[in-house]
């Protein structure tokens, strides 16, 4: 990604959506696509799609559209999916167990390799292909395995404490499923997943924009 262009955060958050859709076209043997087809499938305005893509140079040609293979190569490079991304999860309650069981089965290049909890009845369990470790091993293991990305599913009351430990371990990205906001240094990216807000947003759009 060019260091000369400031890419809007909203654009970056749409890249995985584009990638998943283009991957589905590839699996169907389709070799090119235009912005209207992407718009119809993802319900994103065509102008927004063209603007998003324009930040990354000439990805397509007017009158032709976008080559599927070229788009896939681009998205893989931007989303770091050309290399295996190892992920850890902290907090193996109901949500944590569900995520471990799912373990990004549709993504060949992302996998949860480590899981941590404080509960004695959970530590040592094998969930999916991952054995749950004691939180006491958190910092040491993350450093040793060079894990940069962590999914946080702990109780809210300990979320900040765990986040501080993640920063100490060198983690650069946290997907926070806890209700509370966590504070981290500016070089650590935090994405807050609030299911209540997402559902409220969904209901709003259903009420106001459904045909």
From Swiss-Prot:
A single GO BP term for this record reads:
negative regulation of DNA-templated transcription
Q: Which SUPFAM superfamilies match?
A: NAD(P)-binding Rossmann-fold domains, Winged helix' DNA-binding domain
Q: Which GO terms describe its molecular function?
A: DNA binding; DNA-binding transcription factor activity
Instruction: Give the chief site where it resides.
Output: cytoplasm
InterPro entries with a match to the protein in the record: CoA-bd, NAD(P)-bd_dom_sf, Rex_DNA-bd_C_dom, Tscrpt_rep_Rex, WH-like_DNA-bd_sf, WH_DNA-bd_sf
Pfam families, sorted: CoA_binding, Put_DNA-bind_N
Task of the protein:
Modulates transcription in response to changes in cellular NADH/NAD(+) redox state.
Keyword field: Cytoplasm, DNA-binding, NAD, Repressor, Transcription, Transcription regulation
Q: How does it assemble?
A: Homodimer.
On the tree of life, the source organism's domain of life is Bacteria
Where does the chain bind NAD(+)? 91-96
List the stretches of this chain annotated as a DNA-binding region. 17-56
Q: Which family does it belong to?
A: Belongs to the transcriptional regulatory Rex family.
Q: Where in the cell is it found?
A: Cytoplasm
GO cellular component terms given for this protein: cytoplasm
**Record flagged with keyword Transcription regulation:** yes
State the protein's name: Redox-sensing transcriptional repressor Rex
Which PANTHER family does the record cross-reference, listed alphabetically? REDOX-SENSING TRANSCRIPTIONAL REPRESSOR REX, REDOX-SENSING TRANSCRIPTIONAL REPRESSOR REX 1
Membrane-spanning parts:
none
- Please name the source species: Staphylococcus aureus (strain bovine RF122 / ET3-1)
The UniProt entry, under SMART domains, shows: CoA_binding (SM00881)
